[in-house]
Curated annotation (Swiss-Prot):
Transmembrane segments: 59-79, 165-185, 195-215, 252-272, 294-314, 619-639, 657-677, 687-707, 716-736
Main location: endoplasmic reticulum
UniProt xrefs under Gene3D superfamilies: 2.80.10.50
Recorded GO CC terms: endoplasmic reticulum; endoplasmic reticulum membrane
Organism whose genome encodes this protein: Saccharomyces cerevisiae (strain ATCC 204508 / S288c)
UniProt region (Disordered), positions on chain: 1-31
Name of the protein described by the UniProt record: Dolichyl-phosphate-mannose--protein mannosyltransferase 6
């Protein structure tokens, strides 16, 4: 009994010796071995649990970061491609940008207020569509059957659709709550103004896309701020520069987001400067890398776009008048006529300024309303009979041309230092200046048309000063007399004999009484390099001299063409001012955009046509505008608590507030306030980039407000916001997907009396 009890097996038959011997002789288990076996078992269970959790997390991450944004992107493509060819007429600014694209197909030079990248991309879409350039994109005209306008529009819509994933990852990198990230991406996807602008051959979707990518790249650099100088950081720095170059090459509005990136860069460099552990040589390296990537590369992209622009447009076209003579005469089919190579007394000619405003010297019968009251002298770019002048002998010389345009049968060339008088062919008045202030610029003298062939004084006299001669590639004309005035290749100045000032173009324009033409003055100029006082003869006629048909003009300088083209763009842009005497139903004021006070009819409102109304989503616009009002108070609240030392903010928290709230707010201001302050005419679509940044501000306000709210309150709020965004899109979908038939059917969408959707 005692033995059986000792073994602890009382229930087993002890008469079986073999069995008893087997158990009696078996060694006892070690306690540490049992513990190790138990630990191994627990570790295996934990590993299985950890693997399962990792698999679940990976699946969730793929669903959240890949499948989710992919579905939103597909939705974005669908909404922008949907019914894209339903309106087969030229809609709104397709009349401009479709036509500009066709000029690249035909290689005809044109002028526009915007840089060329966006229009070259439109030309690419036209080339892909097999367009031959013959359709002129006249407003409201139907597209011919042989013009694949659907593909052109789809190409443009692609930029708009890709804004959705850019918005998603930007919001994610900014550190927003994932519900907020998805809400912002959904708002961008369902924004009515973004959808409708993407459906047509316009620049706005490209501008929005590159503005968003520039901001996204900046945010990505923020996430990599502790990994500076790594390959990944360097790649995103390069992408930022490429994006800046693209957005500025589509529209100058891209400069606004460039300012934001510049501000962020300055903050980074300042913080690096304050880092006493950073060697100075590394600090200067940071400067160098940013200068190369954020200044040099964008500028080279901008420059290269113009290089391609000039190479493609090698034929004479509608934009010739905005360029200098050398550029024009090198165009195929130029309108500048071949003429004699020596300019002489009796020659009739046109004279073009070599300044930043390369206009032709012009006069007409109208007089100055103030000042001398004599005939106006202006600069005018287009071919016109009022641009023609004639070289006469000066008043003080007492000489006159005979009936054959010679001096007693002799042809007297115009040489350096000779005194001349310029008479206007149509009015007969003389180019004149006197001690009367100019009308637009300050500190200059008025230039007027005065007298006639027989009436005048010494203030009609000017002295020719030759400043530069350019040689022809043709050896026959490569050694022309450098003291004689030659058309096209000679640059000269006209110094007033009495006042000592120089005939100049200021780059400014006269008011309506001067037909918005360029101001011409007589200015004191102490430098021969002052290009505003440089002129050249463009067209030249003299029946006493032989025409040089085989003359080959010098090539124009790329840098000169680049600078003059950009200045012409700026001048044209500044000229887009509202006409106070004319009501423009399409234009709107900046205050009307965030309030959604007014929209824009994009096409004819006839009942038989598919109609589109450019207006922001009421949900997106109004909720983001409210956020813009709330945001400054949130910042003041944070500063107040920080100042009272009731709130501690770490460096990372300060950065988070800056990136999520302050930079989107600054971006909104830089994209909105310039339009509110500028004098040019403005339209609803000018708010497109600013609206995106207003949505990001809304994301910050939402995240800040709901940070400590219980999930039972937070989730219903998010659900209602998603529901509201989707519901408002569906309600107002006709304004961006097309309205058909009876206009009265859309009266329920007429929420405000200022909206003209239904009438």
């Amino acid at each position: 009994m005692s033995k059986a009890k000792g073994t602890g097996f009382s229930s087993i038959d002890t008469e079986d010796e073999n069995l008893r011997e087997r158990y009696v002789n078996q060694p006892k288990a070690n306690a540490s071995d049992i513990q190790d076996e138990q630990l191994d078992c627990f570790e295996q269970l934990e590993e299985k649990h950890r693997t399962k959790k990792n698999e679940e997390y990976t699946a969730l991450k793929i669903l959240r970061d890949v499948i989710g944004p992919l579905l939103l992107t597909i939705t974005s493509f669908y909404l922008r491609f949907q019914h894209i060819d339903q309106n087969n007429y030229v809609v709104w600014d397709e009349a401009h940008f479709g036509k500009f694209g066709s000029y690249y197909i035909k290689h005809e030079y044109y002028h526009d207020v915007h840089p060329p990248l966006g229009k070259m991309l439109i030309a690419l879409s036209e080339w892909m569509a097999g367009f031959d350039g013959q359709f002129d994109f006249s407003s409201n005209n139907a597209y011919p059957e042989n013009v694949n306008f659907k593909l052109m529009r789809q190409f443009n819509a692609t930029f708009g659709a890709l804004c959705t994933p850019v918005a998603f990852f930007t919001a994610k990198w900014m550190g927003f709550n994932y519900f907020t990230v998805y809400l912002i991406a959904t708002m961008v996807t369902l924004e009515h103004s973004y959808i409708v602008l993407s459906k047509f051959i316009l620049l706005d979707s490209m501008l929005l896309f590159f503005s968003m990518t520039t901001f996204a790249c900046m945010i990505k650099l923020y996430t990599l701020r502790k990994q500076q100088m790594t390959k990944k950081w360097s790649l995103w720095m390069l992408l930022t520069g490429l994006s800046i170059g693209c957005v500025c090459s589509v529209k100058w509005v891209g400069l606004f987001i460039t300012v934001v990136v510049g501000l962020y860069t300055c903050i980074e460099l300042f913080l690096l400067y304050c880092d006493k552990e950073l060697p100075r040589i590394k600090y200067y390296k940071h400067w160098l890398i940013r200068i190369i990537n954020l200044i040099v590369i964008p500028f080279l992209i901008y420059l290269y776009c113009f290089k391609i622009h000039f190479v493609l447009l090698y034929k004479s076209g509608t934009g010739d008048s905005t360029t200098n003579t050398l550029f024009q005469i090198n165009l195929e089919g130029t309108q500048i006529e071949a003429g004699p190579r020596d300019v002489a007394f009796g020659s009739e000619l046109t004279i073009r300024s070599h300044g930043l405003s390369p206009n032709l010297l012009h006069s007409h019968i109208q007089v100055y309303p103030e000042g001398s009251g004599q005939r106006q002298i202006t600069g005018y770019g287009f071919a016109d009979s009022n641009n023609v002048w004639k070289f006469e002998f000066s008043r003080s010389s007492g000489l006159e041309l005979d009936q054959n345009g010679t001096l007693n049968g002799k042809i007297i060339p115009i040489t350096d230092g000779v005194e001349v008088r310029l008479s206007h062919k149509n009015t007969g008045s003389n180019l004149h200046s006197h001690d009367v202030p100019s009308h637009v610029s300050r500190g200059n003298y008025e230039v007027s048309g005065y007298g006639s062939q027989s009436v005048g004084d010494e203030k009609d006299d000017w002295i020719v000063e030759i400043v530069k001669q350019m040689d022809s590639p043709n050896p026959v004309y490569s050694n022309e007399n450098s003291t004689i005035l030659h058309p096209v290749s000679t640059f000269f100045r006209l110094r007033h004999k009495v006042l000592g000032c120089y005939l100049a173009s200021t780059g400014l324009t006269y008011p309506a009484w001067g037909f918005k033409q360029a101001e011409i003055v007589c200015k004191d100029s102490w430098s021969r390099r002052d290009k505003s006082t440089w002129w050249n003869v463009e067209d030249h006629w003299n029946h006493n001299l032989e025409t040089a048909e085989d003359y080959v003009p010098p090539k124009s300088n790329f840098w000169t063409d680049f600078i003059l083209t950009n200045f012409a763009m700026a001048s044209s842009n500044n000229a887009l001012v509202p006409d106070e005497d004319k009501y423009d139903s399409l234009s709107s004021d900046a205050w009307e955009w965030p309030t959604l006070h007014k929209g824009l009819r994009m096409c004819s409102w006839a009942g038989y046509i598919t109609r589109y109304y450019l207006m922001g989503s009421p949900f997106n616009t109004w909720i983001s505008t409210v956020s813009l009002i709330i945001f400054p108070f949130i910042i003041l609240f944070i500063l107040y608590r920080w100042r009272r030392q009731t709130l501690y903010l770490s460096d990372d928290q300060i950065w988070q507030i800056t990136i999520q709230g302050i930079f989107p707010f600054i971006s909104w201001m830089t994209h909105y306030l310039p339009f509110a302050m500028m004098g040019r005419v403005t339209y609803v679509h000018h708010y497109v980039p600013a609206l995106y940044f207003a949505m990001l501000v809304f994301g910050f306000v939402l995240d800040f407000t709901l940070t400590r709210v219980h999930w039972m309150v937070k989730y219903p709020i998010y659900l209602s916001l998603f529901g509201g965004c989707i519901y408002i899109y569906n309600l107002f979908a006709p304004i961006c997907q097309g309205m058909h038939g009876d206009k009265a059917e859309y009266l329920p969408l007429q929420w405000l009396s200022t909206w003209d959707i239904a009438p």
